[in-house]
Amino acid sequence: MNPLVYFSSQSENTHRFICRVDLPALRIPIATEQPALKVDRPYILVVPSYGGGSTKGAVPRQVIIFLNDPHNRAYLRGVIAAGNTNFGAAYCIAGDIIAQKCQVPYLYRFELLGTAEDVANVRKGVTEFWQQQTT
């Protein structure tokens, strides 16, 4: 199965969610001094939303750098976003921004660490998404 590619800050919320989903995954490094992640096959991006309710700064800088690499961007097939409902209309807005800019489907959104239902939905949805891509 093709991987999930994700970014998680030092809070580790997205990382903990990815661990619970238990599918193949690659992590975009937190520190820009670390070696850049290069993907070599199609992937779904899982991204937290930042900015406290504003669209400015909603997509983490590390994710922008990752997607600005044409090689990485070419393999992007979909996006899943994490967020905080306290952000109101900007809840999970990083997913909206990336899906629109990269012309890929926005597959799912979840709050903070996600619930057991979110984990099951993502696991099932990702599996079905890749099965549809191969038929």
Curated annotation (Swiss-Prot):
TM region positions: none
Pfam short name (any one): Flavodoxin_NdrI
S-S bridge residues: none
InterPro entries reported in the protein's UniProt record: Flavoprotein-like_sf (IPR029039), RNR_Ib_NrdI_bac (IPR020852), RNR_NrdI (IPR004465)
GO terms, molecular function: FMN binding
GO BP, sorted A to Z: protein modification process
SUPFAM superfamilies linked: Flavoproteins (SSF52218)
Domain of life the protein comes from: Bacteria
Job of this protein: Probably involved in ribonucleotide reductase function.
HAMAP family: NrdI (MF_00128)
The family this protein is said to belong to: Belongs to the NrdI family.
Protein name: Protein NrdI
